[in-house]
Amino acid sequence: MKRILLTNDDGYESKGLIKLAKMLKKHFKAEITIVAPANEKSACSHSITLTKPLRFQKVKKRFYKLEDGTPADCVYLALHALYKNHLPDLIISGINKGANVGEDITYSGTCAGAMEAVLHGIPAIALSQFYQDDQKELNFKLALNITKKIVKKVFKKGFPLDKKEFLNINFPSSKTNFKGIKICKAGKRIYSYEAHSNINPRGIEYYWLAAANLDHEDEKKSDITLLKQGYATITPIMLNLTAYKQMKNLKKWMKNG
C-alpha cells in the first residue's frame, strides 16, 4: 500500500486540504496521513521552529494539527514521529488558496512543505488554486481532477524529477476557460510593497503588511502569464539557488581592483 502525507499552510480546516484528502482516499488504495498547521501560516516560507517544543493534536485517525507549527515543521516532525518504519511514498502540500507563482515560491509556506519533503529525499508536489478577487467560493474540481492524473502517473511511472526537486502546480481560476496543462518556467513577479499603519486604543502604532495583486513581467511562457490565460501550470523547482551564469563574472569582479 502506498503512503501519502498531506500538509498545507492554510491550516488544518482548509477546504483545499480536506477535498484533496477525500479525493485521494476515494481513488487510491493508499494510507493518507494529514499533518497541518493548527492556524493559517501563509507566506511563512521555509521557517522551522527551533525555540520552543511542538505538539501534535489528533483531529481523528491519521489526521493531526500542529500547534504553532509551520508547513515545514509539519513535514519534518511527521517524518520523525509518525513514520518510524516506512516513510511516505509521496508528500503533497496544498491545495493552497491562491496562486504560488514566480518569486511567490520563495515566500510560500505551501511550497516550503514540498521543499522540506525533498530535503528528506521524498518526492513532493505543491498545489495552489488561483482565484480572482470577486470569487466568493473556490471551485477545486479542476484541481482535483488534474491532481488525480498526476498522482496516478507518479505511482505508475515514478517521480519525474531528481532529488531535491519538486513539482509546483498552479490551477487557473474557475472564472476563466480552462485551456489545458503547460510545463513552464517560473515567471517574474512585480510586487507593490505596502505597509499600512494604524493606532491601537493605547496610542501605539502598528502595521499591516499588504498583499500584492498578481502583477508580473510580460513573458509569454511563464507560469504567471499562462495561469492567467486559463492554463494549469507545472513547474519543476530545484533547491540549488546558485547563479551559475554569474560565477565567471564574480571571479573577475573579485580579482579586479
From Swiss-Prot:
**Which Gene3D superfamilies does the entry link to?**
Survival protein SurE-like phosphatase/nucleotidase
SUPFAM superfamilies xref list: SurE-like
Name this protein carries in UniProt: 5'-nucleotidase SurE
Q: What is its EC number?
A: 3.1.3.5
Offer a single GO CC term for the protein.
Answer: cytoplasm
GO: which molecular function terms? 3'-nucleotidase activity; 5'-nucleotidase activity; exopolyphosphatase activity; metal ion binding; nucleotide binding
Keyword Calcium part of the UniProt annotation: no
> Main EC class of this protein?
hydrolase
Q: Where does a divalent metal cation bind?
A: 9-10, 42, 96
Name the domain of life. Bacteria
